[in-house]
């Protein structure tokens, strides 16, 4: 059984998993974008686009599951078109890529890693917004937060990060 798949490209599977990570340093501003939601904060983030770490990590997770590189390859920071761009544009692009390849989003599990801002009051809006972008039900999207317990650049309040896992599926080759 161990040699059953040796030398074969596993393209016939009906499930794929992708993982994404993004990080941004804090900078001037009065809010951060997280999961497509404007969250008031003592500062903004240093980024070429709107710097939404959750949506950027979501893009990388989808692109990774599809084997299509990363967000920087699709939306290079050197391209002036993406200066200050709404990260929802990036998510819609990645979602279109997966739909064109007959994949659907099964679920999204996102974790924001930050000492501040506190995101609990905004989680439902994030879940609903991400669900709309991906054309899934909000219960298919989890958004939560954790801290780094005061350790590292996040613990010192210098920035924030996010990790996202996405499950893609095909239902007997039929797109739903």
From Swiss-Prot:
Recorded superkingdom: Bacteria
E.C. numbers: 4.6.1.12
Coiled coil: none
Residues annotated to bind 4-CDP-2-C-methyl-D-erythritol 2-phosphate: 22-24, 48-49, 70-72, 146-149, 153, 156
Residue(s) at site: Transition state stabilizer: 48, 147
Disulphides: none
Keywords for the protein's UniProt record, in alphabetical order: Isoprene biosynthesis, Lyase, Metal-binding
Pfam families according to UniProt: YgbB (PF02542)
Record GO terms (molecular function): 2-C-methyl-D-erythritol 2,4-cyclodiphosphate synthase activity; metal ion binding
Catalytic activity: 4-CDP-2-C-methyl-D-erythritol 2-phosphate = 2-C-methyl-D-erythritol 2,4-cyclic diphosphate + CMP
Named cofactor requirement(s): a divalent metal cation
Co-factor remark: Binds 1 divalent metal cation per subunit.
Pathway membership, UniProt: Isoprenoid biosynthesis; isopentenyl diphosphate biosynthesis via DXP pathway; isopentenyl diphosphate from 1-deoxy-D-xylulose 5-phosphate: step 4/6
Name of the top EC class for this enzyme: lyase
Positions bound to a divalent metal cation: 22, 24, 56
Family recorded in the similarity comment: Belongs to the IspF family.
NCBIfam families linked: ispF
Function text: Involved in the biosynthesis of isopentenyl diphosphate (IPP) and dimethylallyl diphosphate (DMAPP), two major building blocks of isoprenoid compounds. Catalyzes the conversion of 4-diphosphocytidyl-2-C-methyl-D-erythritol 2-phosphate (CDP-ME2P) to 2-C-methyl-D-erythritol 2,4-cyclodiphosphate (ME-CPP) with a corresponding release of cytidine 5-monophosphate (CMP).
Assembly behavior: Homotrimer.
PANTHER family: 2-C-METHYL-D-ERYTHRITOL 2,4-CYCLODIPHOSPHATE SYNTHASE, CHLOROPLASTIC (PTHR43181:SF1)
Protein name (database record): 2-C-methyl-D-erythritol 2,4-cyclodiphosphate synthase
Organism this protein belongs to: Xylella fastidiosa (strain 9a5c)
